[in-house]
Amino acid sequence: MSRLEDYLSVYFITDSEFGRTHEELAEMALRAGVRAIQFREKKLSTKRMYEIGKRLRALTRDYDALFFVNDRIDVALAVDADGVHIGQDDMPAFAAREIFPGYIGVSAGNVEEAKKDERFADYLGVGPVFPTKTKEDAGEAIGIEGLRRIVESVSVPVVAIGSINKQNAIEVLKTGVAGIAVISAIAAADDPERAARELVELVRRFKSGL
């Protein structure tokens, strides 16, 4: 298993819509053992994104975790993020590869998209596996079988996303994904740190064959 895959087991995407700040949520997840944090924010100014990004970068370093910025390669470069995550409507993966030196994750919702971008990507974010309300432009759910087809068609690590929680995570992990990406399973929980710890332990036990 590569170093990157080790970090991707539970991948938390921060969301401030649930009453806590990006920084508060990230630190709770990091304390629980999450080792990949993505900062996704579509509504703030570039200046505010930079300020929050710098704080998240410092936090993730404290916990030896990887830090990704969604879409904004400029912010990722400015805060020295480990990686950037881009969608199908963002900068093309091949162009991002020319200007960004770190990890690049690319969203894919079908085999065609996955195969098109895998040679430029360090990992693929695949989904939504289940119907989701957290991302307005997420598209139709691909289901477990859709996820499995994509995992089997590419050679880079796949991180599954889309309404994944501790009730359905094992079913998702059985497809061979490197990890699961979550938002509301942690951010919307009454106790985000506990929710994150339960997910981390669940994935650890699955990967250990327990």
From Swiss-Prot:
InterPro entries, per the entry: Aldolase_TIM (IPR013785), ThiamineP_synth_sf (IPR036206), ThiamineP_synth_TenI (IPR022998), TMP_synthase (IPR034291)
Cofactor binding, per record: Binds 1 Mg(2+) ion per subunit.
Catalyzed reactions: 2-[(2R,5Z)-2-carboxy-4-methylthiazol-5(2H)-ylidene]ethyl phosphate + 4-amino-2-methyl-5-(diphosphooxymethyl)pyrimidine + 2 H(+) = thiamine phosphate + CO2 + diphosphate; 2-(2-carboxy-4-methylthiazol-5-yl)ethyl phosphate + 4-amino-2-methyl-5-(diphosphooxymethyl)pyrimidine + 2 H(+) = thiamine phosphate + CO2 + diphosphate; 4-methyl-5-(2-phosphooxyethyl)-thiazole + 4-amino-2-methyl-5-(diphosphooxymethyl)pyrimidine + H(+) = thiamine phosphate + diphosphate
One MF annotation (Gene Ontology) recorded for this entry: thiamine-phosphate diphosphorylase activity
Binding site for 2-[(2R,5Z)-2-carboxy-4-methylthiazol-5(2H)-ylidene]ethyl phosphate: 132-134, 183-184
CDD domains referenced in this protein's UniProt entry, alphabetically: TMP_TenI
Binding site residues for 4-amino-2-methyl-5-(diphosphooxymethyl)pyrimidine: 38-42, 70, 107, 135
Gene3D superfamilies noted in UniProt: Aldolase class I
Cofactor: Mg(2+)
EC code(s) of this entry: 2.5.1.3
Binding site for Mg(2+): 71, 90
Source taxon at top rank: Archaea
Pfam family, one: TMP-TENI
GO cellular component, one term: cytoplasm
GO biological process, one term: thiamine biosynthetic process
Keyword RNA-binding: no
EC top class named in words: transferase
Keywords: Magnesium, Metal-binding, Thiamine biosynthesis, Transferase
The keyword Aminoacyl-tRNA synthetase is annotated on this UniProt entry: no
Pathway of action: Cofactor biosynthesis; thiamine diphosphate biosynthesis; thiamine phosphate from 4-amino-2-methyl-5-diphosphomethylpyrimidine and 4-methyl-5-(2-phosphoethyl)-thiazole: step 1/1
SUPFAM superfamilies named in the record: Thiamin phosphate synthase (SSF51391)
Functional note: Condenses 4-methyl-5-(beta-hydroxyethyl)thiazole monophosphate (THZ-P) and 2-methyl-4-amino-5-hydroxymethyl pyrimidine pyrophosphate (HMP-PP) to form thiamine monophosphate (TMP).
HAMAP family attached to this UniProt entry: TMP_synthase
Similarity annotation: Belongs to the thiamine-phosphate synthase family.
Identification of the protein by name: Thiamine-phosphate synthase
Organism name: Archaeoglobus fulgidus (strain ATCC 49558 / DSM 4304 / JCM 9628 / NBRC 100126 / VC-16)
Lineage of source species: Archaea, Methanobacteriati, Methanobacteriota, Archaeoglobi, Archaeoglobales
